[in-house]
Every structure is written in structure tokens, then in C-alpha cells.
């Protein structure tokens, strides 16, 4: 999947943070209509259909003003998931709030894309695992680690996992806690170009990026890089592949 396609999903993930009235207008501007809005105990998602009749399920990420979102992020224990392995307790709790309604809404849909940012990326990953036969692709931005090795190996969905340079959320929960990442890792460097780097090369690249950012007055690059607007800005640089 190339930057123009990823940018579409990035915009959808960003608009998902909006309330329905505002979201409706913004989704329409990019060729999507709202099929259903899910909102249960501050867990939220939109089921959309674009002008080509393709369905997209998008999950809202962490709202720093919502205590339930923060608590979900902090509950780092693991629970068994049906497809195999164990997943983050807090993320599972959030998707479970919406799952009965989502399962019903997609029951007659044969195929769809799934996306989300931050907590929404984790929820999107778990949801995709529960309906793997329907998912054309999972596209996530700034995703934390969701489950253990067994769980990750149980996921067969095509997953484009986009990381913006020093995004701190992509580094938690920690590897030492038994959590693993899933999917094709799409790492964007400081300039917005995708780079296929080893783990050690990526660490060196991020150190260089933090030094560059600090000289420009950006002291919290890890938080800055996690912002959805900054994913969109870098994905908009089509010429820097």
C-alpha cells in the first residue's frame, strides 16, 4: 500500500475523533458516508461506506480528556483471546464494549477495511482478528503492541502498521512484558520517507531525529510524532518514497 492510499485511511482515522455532526461533513468531503456510529461508554467507532461501495470500520483513539481511555491504556495485563494467545486487558475491555453492536452491523457485509490510531489502532487490530475472513486489510497508525507472540501468530489479516519516526506509543506495552507487534511495519523517518531498517538502524535513526528536533525546539518528539495530524502531514509528502 502506497502513501496516497495510506493517506486516505489516515484522514478517516483522524475524522473518527470528531462527533457525528462534524464527522458527517468531513467524511462526505472525502467520499464517505456514515452507515453507523457506535458509542458505548466512551468507546467509539464509525462504520462507513465510500463512493465505490467499500465499507471501512474506523475506531477512535485515546482522548486525553476521557478517564476511561486513559485507564484502558494503563491496564497492561493480558487476557485470553478466542483466536489464540493473549491480549492487553485494557484494549480488550474497550473493544468488548462495542463488539456486539459491531458484529451485528457487519453480519451482512462480506468484506471491509479496518483502521484506527493509537488506542483505536489496538481496537482495530482486535476487531480484525475476530472477523479475519471479512477483512481486506487492516491499516493502523501509531499502534501500541496488542498481544503476545501466540496471539500475533494467530492473526492472518493483511496489516499495514504505520509508525511515524519517534512515536512513543508504538513502544508500549514493553517487549519485556511479553507483548509483540503484528503486521508489516511501515516506518517513516524524520522527513516522512518510508525506510526499511533493522531494529538497530531504526534506533540510530530515531536518536538522530531527536537531536534534530531538539535543535529546532521540539523537546517532546515522541508525543509530537504520535499526533494524527503529523502522520497526515508526512503521508502528504508523496515525492519522498
Spans of features found by a protein language model:
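Non-catalytic, mobile gating and regulatory segments of ester bond hydrolases
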Residues: 1-115, 119-241
Amino acid at each position: 500500500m502506497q502513501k496516497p492510499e495510506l493517506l486516505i485511511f489516515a484522514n478517516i482515522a483522524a475524522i473518527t475523533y470528531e462527533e457525528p455532526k462534524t464527522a458527517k461533513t468531513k467524511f462526505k468531503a472525502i467520499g464517505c458516508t456514515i452507515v453507523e456510529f457506535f458509542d458505548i461508554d466512551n468507546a467509539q467507532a464509525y462504520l462507513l461506506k465510500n463512493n465505490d461501495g467499500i465499507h471501512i470500520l474506523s475506531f477512535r483513539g485515546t482522548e486525553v480528556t476521557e478517564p476511561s481511555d486513559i485507564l484502558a491504556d494503563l491496564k497492561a495485563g493480558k487476557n485470553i483471546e478466542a483466536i489464540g494467545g493473549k491480549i492487553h486487558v485494557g484494549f480488550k475491555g474497550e473493544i468488548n464494549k462495542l463488539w456486539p453492536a459491531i458484529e451485528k452491523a457487519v453480519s451482512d457485509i462480506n468484506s471491509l477495511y479496518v483502521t484506527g490510531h493509537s488506542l483505536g489502532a489496538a481496537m482495530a487490530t482486535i476487531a480484525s482478528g475476530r472477523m479475519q475472513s471479512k477483512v481486506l486489510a487492516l491499516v493502523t497508525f501509531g499502534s501500541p503492541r496488542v498481544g503476545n507472540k501466540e496471539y500475533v501468530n494467530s492473526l492472518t489479516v493483511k496489516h499495514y502498521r504505520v509508525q511515524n519516526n519517534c512515536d512513543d506509543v508504538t513502544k508500549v506495552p514493553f517487549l519485556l512484558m511479553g507483548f509483540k507487534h503484528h503486521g508489516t511495519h511501515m516506518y517513516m523517518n524524520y522527513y516522512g520517507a518510508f525506510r526499511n531498517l533493522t531494529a538497530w538502524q531504526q534506533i540510530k535513526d530515531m536518536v538522530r531525529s531527536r537531536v534534530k528536533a531538539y535543535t529546532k525546539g521540539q523537546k517532546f518528539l515522541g508525543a509530537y510524532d504520535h499526533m494524527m495530524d503529523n502522520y497526515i502531514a508526512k503521508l502528504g509528502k508523496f515525492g519522498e518514497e
